[in-house]
Regions:
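Sec-dependent bacterial lipoprotein signal peptides
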Residues: 1-19
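Cyclophilin-like peptidyl-prolyl cis-trans isomerases
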Residues: 2, 21-242
Length: 242
């Protein structure tokens, strides 16, 4: 297993990787979203394996459209239990997208208190990390607070594909950190935020509707990175892939 100390270099590279990745910054975005051409990723990595019959998927019905993500309960059991429990309780229904960083992340799930909730009476749970899941574009992740713990806040990685987000410098640092070739190759095609690996929980991967996530990612935001016009999560549903 890759030692977490090797991540220092990638974390230091984060600021460089994010420079210039936005479509507009504060107040950015426009009335018509720019279509992002995302290539198909041919990879043996779990996140790029199409869902199989019986896999658990989450369906996000938003005011901007619908997107779907396959979940990986075997890799993040506490996050899965909490997320599914909150979905079944209707917690996310009616919440709005709380943060958008174009070309980086789309985030929601804070709730009225701005902190989020859990099925354990608000008690936090630790981030769950694994060598099997990574912050590729389209990854569904659970946000962490300052203590490194999670609640209901989730985000989708909305980084641009290929070298638009994964620069040669990041590739070199992944190689130096001991990444396997398959992971580096997947990052080079899909794009992503490798500097977030091993810092928080990857719970799933968007397999349909990434164009909706991209459209949300290009919305105009205020100085707090909140969309100027509300983008509402009408509902989140858990179902089995058929």
């Amino acid at each position: 297993m890759m030692h977490k100390k090797r991540w220092a270099a990638l974390v230091l590279a984060a600021a460089l990787a994010l420079t210039g990745c936005s479509f507009g910054g504060v107040g950015g975005g426009g009335n018509t979203a720019q279509k992002i051409d995302r290539p198909a990723v041919e990879s043996a990595e779990l996140q790029f394996t199409h869902p199989a019959a019986g896999d658990t998927v989450a369906v996000f019905d938003t005011s901007a459209g619908v997107f779907r993500a396959v979940l990986f309960p075997d890799k993040a059991l506490q996050a899965y239990d909490n997320f599914v429990g909150l979905v079944q309780a209707g917690y996310y229904n009616g919440l709005t997208v709380s943060r958008v960083e174009s070309g980086f992340v789309v985030e929601a799930g804070q709730g009225a208190d701005g902190r989020g909730s859990t099925i354990w009476n608000g008690g936090r749970y630790p981030a769950e990390t694994t060598d099997s899941l990574h912050h590729y574009s389209g990854a569904l992740c659970m946000g962490t607070d300052a203590s490194g713990e999670c609640a209901s806040v989730f985000y989708v990685v909305q980084t641009l594909p290929g070298e638009q987000s994964v620069t040669q410098e990041l590739v070199d640092q992944m190689n130096s950190a001991g990444y396997c070739a398959e992971v580096v190759s997947a990052y080079q095609t899909a794009g992503g935020a490798p500097y977030l690996d091993y810092t928080d929980t990857v719970l799933g991967q968007v397999y349909e509707g990434m164009d909706v996530v991209d459209a949300i990612g290009q919305t105009a935001v205020d100085e707090n990175q909140k969309p100027r016009e509300d983008i509402t999560i009408n509902s989140v549903s858990i179902m089995q892939y058929e």
